[in-house]
A protein has these predicted regions:
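Structural signal for interior beta-strand "rungs" in well-ordered beta-sheet cores
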Residues: 5-135, 140-142
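Acidic/histidine-enriched, glycine/proline-rich intrinsically disordered or flexible terminal extensions
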Residues: 151-173
Length: 173
């Protein structure tokens, strides 16, 4: 469901997919090939939330930003996979990342490109992680550097969800 808010109407590419039970609210930009799946909420009522090309927001996720100006926007790069029930708040996610199921990423945090945030991780406010990091725990810490070969497999996850979104689009419209 696309919901305008305070004179901001979500800008959803015709080549993107939004599940009927998902809510895209206010200042949101979804690029080509991106998808927001079932029962997820992307709430751009404080500032812009941008979802990059071929990125997927899986079932039950919440994306929101803070009313504090410095955390009022969110950027999700290209080819990002955000796992089921993740909560992202006022953060920046680099290209090619995998955000694990049930993880929480707080205001002002930056996840470097081609990184993995493990399932259930808690990334506290203001933390910055370098590219190619495996980030796990509560509070989250870098536990190792991932190889470029492993990072390439993350792109495959995003491509797989893009193909699935195309199938949903055919069936559901």
């Amino acid at each position: 469901m696309i919901i305008p808010f305070k004179n901001n109407t979500p800008d959803v590419s015709e080549a993107a997919f939004v599940a009927e039970s998902a809510q895209i609210i206010g200042s949101v930009k979804m690029h080509e090939g991106s998808c927001v799946l079932f029962n997820s909420t992307v709430r751009g009522d404080n500032g812009l939330i941008e979802i990059g090309k071929y990125s997927n927001i899986q079932d039950g996720c919440t994306l929101h930003t803070s009313s504090a100006k410095e955390f009022s926007t969110m950027t999700i790069g290209d080819y990002v996979t955000v796992g089921h029930n993740a909560v992202l708040h006022g953060c920046t996610i680099g290209d090619g990342c995998l955000i694990g199921m049930g993880s929480i990423i707080m205001d002002g945090s930056v996840i470097g490109e081609h990184s993995i945030v493990g399932a259930g991780a808690l990334v506290t406010s203001g933390k910055t992680y370098p590219p190619y990091s495996l980030i796990m725990g509560s509070p989250a810490k870098v536990v190792k550097t991932i190889t470029p070969e492993r990072a390439d497999t993350l792109l495959g996850y995003a491509e797989g969800y893009y193909q699935k979104a195309l199938e949903y689009k055919k069936v559901l419209g």
